[in-house]
């Protein structure tokens, strides 16, 4: 019962869309109405408000970290509990019950989850994102590369293979890549927006 309640709680935590909440609180347009129409920090940055984008990034990462940390802190369900919380908070962000199941792509939330699972894993994955984003200026490309490397880091840095948490990390990576399928098409076509680029449609 504890595992079930923790999983539901993690999903509800993930369902809080900080892109929408922060934008509304700061009097900005709903991020689902412009740019990529994705409620995430990168799209909020297209509004021109860096503060809102940073708050969105921090909020989305924090909720991912919090959901997993709480399960670990109170020892709910061991590795299975951690894995379920990780997947649940991630799915909550992707398909938030509070926002008609129209969520983001999960990059910041996944980073928060990984930081809670293992700080070094989270930092290694975040560093991968930063390096790719710095050199290529594509948030989506950075996210895709980080998603590919996250489970690899998990295996080779920590030797985690056949356990629930490792499978959860792999599942999040696959889901994140799938959520970026339109970005993949635009990257291949040379139509993807760069970081900080304002755009009213597409992306």
Swiss-Prot record:
Keywords: Cell inner membrane, Cell membrane, Lipid biosynthesis, Lipid metabolism, Membrane, Phospholipid biosynthesis, Phospholipid metabolism, Transferase, Transmembrane, Transmembrane helix. The keyword Lipid metabolism applies. Its EC number is 2.3.1.275. Pathway: Lipid metabolism; phospholipid metabolism. InterPro entries: G3P_acylTferase_PlsY. It is found in: Cell inner membrane. Its main location: membrane. The chain crosses the membrane at residues 3-23, 51-71, 74-94, 116-136, 140-160, 164-178. Pfam families: G3P_acyltransf. GO terms for biological process: phospholipid biosynthetic process. HAMAP family: PlsY. Probably interacts with PlsX. Catalyzes the transfer of an acyl group from acyl-phosphate (acyl-PO(4)) to glycerol-3-phosphate (G3P) to form lysophosphatidic acid (LPA). This enzyme utilizes acyl-phosphate as fatty acyl donor, but not acyl-CoA or acyl-ACP. Belongs to the PlsY family. This is Glycerol-3-phosphate acyltransferase. It comes from Burkholderia pseudomallei (strain K96243).
């Amino acid at each position: 019962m504890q595992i079930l309640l923790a999983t539901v709680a993690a999903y509800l935590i993930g369902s809080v869309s900080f892109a929408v909440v922060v934008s509304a609180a700061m009097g900005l347009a709903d991020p689902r109405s412009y740019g990529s129409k994705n409620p995430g920090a990168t799209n909020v940055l297209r509004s021109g408000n860096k503060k809102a984008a940073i708050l969105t990034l921090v909020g989305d990462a924090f909720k991912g970290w919090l959901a997993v940390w709480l399960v670990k802190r109170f020892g709910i369900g061991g590795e299975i509990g951690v894995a379920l919380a990780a997947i649940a908070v991630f799915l909550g962000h992707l398909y938030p019950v509070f926002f008609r199941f129209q969520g983001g792509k999960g990059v910041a939330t996944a980073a928060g989850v990984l930081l809670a699972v293992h700080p070094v894993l989270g930092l290694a994955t975040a560093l991968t994102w930063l390096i790719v984003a710095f050199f290529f200026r594509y948030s989506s490309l950075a996210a895709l590369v980080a998603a590919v490397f996250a489970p690899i880091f998990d295996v080779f840095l920590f030797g985690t293979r056949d356990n629930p948490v490792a499978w959860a990390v792999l599942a999040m990576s696959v889901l994140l890549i799938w959520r970026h399928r339109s970005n993949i098409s635009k990257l291949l076509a040379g139509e993807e927006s760069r970081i900080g680029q304002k755009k009213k449609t597409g992306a």
